[in-house]
């Protein structure tokens, strides 16, 4: 267990003529005092070399944590499904969501939101049955934060490791029914469906190459205590430990 460590977070955006901003990139790491500088350099490089555009605003936050604040959990098990078309991939994702209890109505809302939004900074929380949005945060959404791997050498590439760490934290809340995600990066067409029972199911292609729409949807239960759930997602530090299966 780390006695003292630091949450190191990055957010990058590009200003537009209307006074708003386009989300470019984000990043989350947890490390020791001696790891702060190399992690900051890594996150800056990610922000400055991104396919979504040239960031003219980059924010780095370094926050001290104590070891007793950190929760440890094993990663979700990974499976991969390759489909021949976006239509078939969507059908497969919907089938999985149905199997874990997400209604067709909520699925319709989720797929519409992910296909039509190109500037979501955080996740959208949807009621798993009604499809009603619960977080009321607009494009900001809910940012899952303070997450990393205990061991950096766990296999797979950086993109999959980051997404799996996030999905693992989300799935370990009793209020999460399932997560649906695909990236807003234009070159990346793979997404996933996940929860604590089915694990992390990668599905491709969930969108066409060159498309910048995407984001994350968390389907939540009737029993959700919204303030507690959001606090867990945004504030409680988590380290993922164990080998990928």
From Swiss-Prot:
Description of how activity is regulated: Inhibited by magnesium above 10 mM and metal chelators such as 1, 10-phenanthroline and EDTA.
The protein's name: 6-carboxyhexanoate--CoA ligase
pH dependence as annotated: Optimum pH is between 8.5 and 9.0.
Purpose: Catalyzes the transformation of pimelate into pimeloyl-CoA with concomitant hydrolysis of ATP to AMP.
E.C. designation(s): 6.2.1.14
GO molecular function, one term: ATP binding
Pathway(s) of this molecule: Metabolic intermediate metabolism; pimeloyl-CoA biosynthesis; pimeloyl-CoA from pimelate: step 1/1
One Pfam family recorded for the sequence: BioW
Family recorded in the similarity comment: Belongs to the BioW family.
Organism: Lysinibacillus sphaericus (Bacillus sphaericus)
